[in-house]
Swiss-Prot record:
Gene Ontology MF annotations: ATP binding; protein serine kinase activity; protein serine/threonine kinase activity; protein serine/threonine/tyrosine kinase activity; protein tyrosine kinase activity
EC number(s) from the headed UniProt entry: 2.7.12.1
Lineage: Eukaryota, Metazoa, Chordata, Craniata, Vertebrata
InterPro entries per record: Dual_SerThr-Tyr_Kinase, Kinase-like_dom_sf, Prot_kinase_dom, Protein_kinase_ATP_BS, Ser/Thr_kinase_AS
Keyword Signal in record: no
Domain Protein kinase per the UniProt entry, residue ranges: 627-881
Entry annotated with the keyword Cell membrane: yes
Species of provenance: Pimephales promelas
Keywords linked to the UniProt accession: ATP-binding, Cell junction, Cell membrane, Coiled coil, Cytoplasm, Developmental protein, Kinase, Membrane, Nucleotide-binding, Serine/threonine-protein kinase, Transferase, Tyrosine-protein kinase
Protein name: Dual serine/threonine and tyrosine protein kinase
One Gene Ontology term from the biological process aspect of the record: positive regulation of ERK1 and ERK2 cascade
Top EC class, one word: transferase
Length: 903
């Protein structure tokens, strides 16, 4: 090698870059393997659930949670790629010199030792492809690409060597075709080769470049180097480079190999640089900067030119790192997107399942109550309406009498052959005529009475039946069993229509209605005829008159009400029976839903969240590197906080290191990280910049999660000790309420609002931090978490909602009003945490100080009310606080008039 002493930084840094790639690739491969196993398990569990519980869950919550096949295949290809350094060049001498420079030793012959020139000057060059791999012992062999080793006597086998013999590099004229295609495998015990393989392409006279690169299209991640020994590239070489770009869509690092005369004066752009820029083979902005090009997105990566071989490491190492990282960043971004998408689906489905578990029993109970109210109301109408109905029938008959007589006189009989002069007919025909006249009267009377009866219960149909049908429709949809409960629901709706839509019963042509009409007709007194009369209009009128007078309004009313009650009772019983069947179906479904909900909360979501944390942390360390820990800022129950001067272009930062002791804590931390990372940025919350998993924490004895977040000036505890004026304290209270309201609006509970979890900037504006206990309500398991003084009584029962944050704010507001960090007397007297909890559950609260403003005291009392339902909503607390602040702080002379500091 020309300058072996200069190869140190290049070898060291390049080996480190490939080592980091391989280490990160192992982590990525492990995460991908566990992700595939997770989704396979979800799919199997889902299939087993469907097979044991019928079709209920077949179209249920977990069908959309899957690993898209094309994403999985793409990621499998990425993690399966081995890093390669591909060396191309204008001629074999330039390639060999670049290889020697990279390995730091003169392994390949140069100059006269290498034989004749290749390319345009020496067309007889027959140097074959070289492949460098790692091994414990140095050896050379010929092998067909991707196949088997050839038994061939090489010159290197005949004795000791330091430089590969020229005869072994060249294809001999007498070799058979198989040996002419074989590549020379050189095995070395070398640090760089432990991390990556190196391939030197053959002379173009031996094999065209596109054929030589064909084996590199799959399963490798190439770092492409092109050695340039001339001032510019020829047209054939540019064409060759175009084929390289078509075969392998990766950027190329061009390396100028020094020749005897200096090609260009120092500090000037070379002709080669201008040519490469014009051909869009390198980026014009990057130039030949010794520091390397800035980070670029994978799709926008460009080649680079290194014009100084002695300073090659300053160009090649950043270039190699960029190529290696870009693919891994893309892969981790894709994998994390799959994790986050499915995790969000899990959380949303947990909300849906929790709501289903809460609302379905209420809907069933509501349906039962409403039907009972409807039944009672209609039965009351049937019982009290009989006398009214009798009067209504009499009034109806009186009002309709003349019209009925007129219609009867003009009635045209059916199925009776009438004579032209209305002569007397047989007794049989006369009976038919009388029956038709009676039918006319009964039908008209039925219509009139039915319309009036319907109007009397119309408001009940609108109030009850519509609501019942909507409830039934909702219950039907939530069963997920169209073959079973859908029929029951439809039957229930048919019963409702038949029983309660009164006009349908009266107006339909059903057998029930015909029976009803027959019963009414039996009330009419039979008319006997001695001699068959002449069927004239007067006769028809007389028959109708007698029929109307023979009707008994009392019996008719009694019959109608009796029918109404009978149908009502039977419908009520059928409804109750069908509702019980529907409830039984829902009971089994809800049991399975609750089991699935528990699995989502306890197993599925936490496991996926851990995979998401790992993929996101891997992406962050690829993009921004591992953060440097500064001085310790503080310690908490679950971690240590350090200063971090700069990370990801943000400074200063705070770094919280958490060492989860077991899988449960890992999963909890991962879920909490997901909730926090998913939150939109808000000025009242401390920003979380990213995370890194440190596998070497504590000298490699444990694994720590490093959470990098926004650095603020101090916490509220320190601020109160230092002294804050009233206006600042009230503004802090407003800021905290605004932050809690935002969290609640995102469906999250903080569960640990306290002085040390409120940070202040240099203007003493507050931000909420430490979302360690932050969770959506649907994902809570009822665990007892928080700081004892700020914990609401219901937290000890495990059943609570977001009002626990209102309680905690009430305690925090007490401290803000006192202006000190001194414990309330009721809490200071407690000798242990258990005694404190007992007193809080019994109703012990902070005392009122003489300096407190009345409105402030009322607000904090309302916030820490023992009954969660009696605590004010934060939407009410915020304007109340603003009103207090306006009243107490508008006039600077009154800032301390109504509320004095007690410290």
């Amino acid at each position: 090698m020309e300058n072996p002493q200069k190869a140190g930084p290049l070898l060291r840094d390049l080996t480190r870059a490939f080592s980091h790639y391989n280490k990160h690739n192992l982590l990525l491969k492990k995460n991908l393997k566990e992700t595939i196993a997770f989704f396979r398990e979800i799919r199997q569990n889902h299939s087993n659930t469907c097979s044991t519980s019928g079709p209920e869950l077949d179209s249920g919550q977990l069908r959309c949670i899957s690993f898209p096949r094309h994403d999985e295949d793409h990621l499998q290809k990425v993690v399966g790629c081995a890093p390669y350094i591909l060396i191309l060049g204008q001629d074999c001498s330039a390639r060999y010199q670049l290889l020697n420079c990279m390995l730091g030793e003169r392994l390949l012959p140069l100059g006269s030792d290498a034989g004749g020139a290749c390319g345009v000057e020496g067309g007889a060059c027959r140097r074959r492809k070289l492949c460098f791999t790692h091994g414990r012992q140095t050896r050379l062999s010929l092998a067909l690409p991707g196949q088997y080793e050839l038994v061939h006597q090489l010159a290197a086998h005949c004795g000791r060597w330091d430089t590969v013999p020229r005869e072994d590099l060249e294809i001999q004229e007498c070799e058979d075709p198989a040996q002419r295609l074989a590549e020379l495998e050189i095995t070395l015990h070398h640090a760089l080769l432990q991390e990556a393989k190196i391939m030197v392409l053959p002379c173009r006279n031996v094999q065209p470049v596109e054929e030589a690169l064909e084996d590199c299209r799959r399963g490798i991640l190439p770092i492409i180097l092109y050695a340039v020994s001339k001032a510019t590239l020829s047209a054939d070489q540019l064409s060759e480079l175009q084929k390289v770009r078509e075969t392998l869509p990766y950027p190329v690092c061009f390396v100028r190999i020094p020749t005897e005369p200096a090609p260009d004066p120092p500090g000037q752009r070379s002709a080669l640089f201008a040519q490469l820029v014009s051909q869009e083979l390198i980026g014009g902005a990057a130039g030949n900067c010794a520091c390397g090009a800035p980070a670029q997105t994978p799709g926008k990566m460009q080649g680079i030119l290194g014009e100084d071989l002695e300073r090659l490491h300053r160009v090649l190492v950043p270039f190699a790192r960029q190529v290696l990282q870009s693919q891994q960043v893309e892969a981790t971004t894709l994998l994390n997107a799959v994790h986050c998408r499915c995790l969000d689906l899990f959380i949303n489905q947990a909300f849906d399942m929790q709501r289903d578990l809460q609302i379905t029993p209420r809907r069933l109970e509501y349906t039962r109550e409403k039907e009972g109210e409807l039944y009672s109301s209609l039965m009351a109408i049937a019982n009290r309406k009989q006398e009214e109905m009798k009067e209504m029938i009499v009034e109806t008959l009186e009002s309709m009498k003349e019209q009925l007589l007129e219609d009867a006189a003009n009635l045209e009989f059916t199925d009776i052959i009438m004579t032209s002069n209305s002569e007397p007919m047989s007794s049989k025909d006369i009976k038919v005529c009388i029956s038709q006249i009676q039918d006319l009267i009964v039908i008209r009377l039925n219509q009139a009475v039915a319309n009036k009866l319907t109007s009397s219960v119309d408001y009940l149909r609108e109030s009850f039946v519509g609501t019942l049908e909507r409830c039934l429709c909702s219950l039907e949809k939530s069963t997920g069993e169209p073959c079973a409960h859908n029929v029951t629901s439809n039957h229930l709706k048919q019963i409702l229509n038949a029983a309660y839509h009164v006009e349908v019963t009266f107006h339909s042509g059903s057998s029930v209605t015909r029976l009803f009409w027959e019963q009414i007709k039996q009330i009419i007194h039979r008319i006997s005829w001695v001699n068959p009369p002449s069927v004239t209009s007067e006769w028809k009128r007389k028959v109708a008159q007698d029929a109307i007078e023979s009707l008994s309004a009392a019996k008719l009313a009694k019959s109608i009400c009796s029918q109404f009650r009978t149908r009502l009772n039977s419908s009520h019983e059928a409804f109750a029976s069908s509702l019980r069947q529907l409830e039984e179906g829902h009971t089994g479904r809800l049991e399975r839903t609750e089991d699935l909900w528990l699995r989502v909360r306890k197993d599925h979501a936490p496991r996926l969240a851990r995979l998401s944390l790992e993929s996101r942390s891997l992406r962050d360390i690829l993009l921004h590197g591992k953060p440097k820990l500064g001085r310790e800022l503080g310690r908490g129950q679950y971690g240590v906080v350090y200063l971090c001067d700069n990370w990801a272009g943000r400074h200063p930062c705070a770094l919280k290191s958490v060492v989860p002791p077991d899988d449960k804590h890992w999963n909890d931390l991962a879920l909490e990280f997901h909730y926090t990372r998913s939150l939109p940025k808000h000025e009242r919350l401390v920003n979380l910049h990213g995370s890194v998993i440190d596998h070497s924490y504590g000298g490699g004895s444990s694994i720590a999660v490093l959470l990098i977040m926004e650095r603020l000036h101090r916490d509220l505890y320190t601020g109160l000790k230092a002294g804050l004026v009233l206006k600042e304290r009230l503004q802090i209270a407003l800021d905290v309420v605004e932050g809690i309201r935002f969290l609640h609006g995102q469906g999250l509970l903080h569960r640990d609002i306290k002085l040390k979890n409120v940070l202040l900037d240099k203007q003493n504006r507050a931000k909420i931090t430490d979302l360690g206990f932050c969770k959506p309500e649907a994902m809570m398991s009822g665990s007892i978490v928080g700081t004892p003084i700020h914990m609401a009584p219901e937290l000890f029962t495990g059943k609570y909602d977001n009002s626990v944050d209102v309680y905690a704010f009430g305690i925090l507001f007490w401290y803000l009003c006192t202006g000190s960090v001194k414990l309330p007397e009721a809490f200071e007297r407690c000798s242990s945490k258990d005694q404190l909890w007992t007193n809080v559950k019994k109703g012990s609260r902070p005392e009122r100080l003489a300096s407190f403003d009345e409105e402030c005291w009322q607000l904090m009392e309302a916030c820490w009310n023992g009954d969660p339902s009696q605590r004010p909503l934060l939407g009410i607390v915020q304007p109340s606080l603003q009103s207090i602040m306006d009243r107490l702080c508008n006039d600077s002379d009154q800032k301390s008039g109504n509320l004095e500091d007690s410290n």
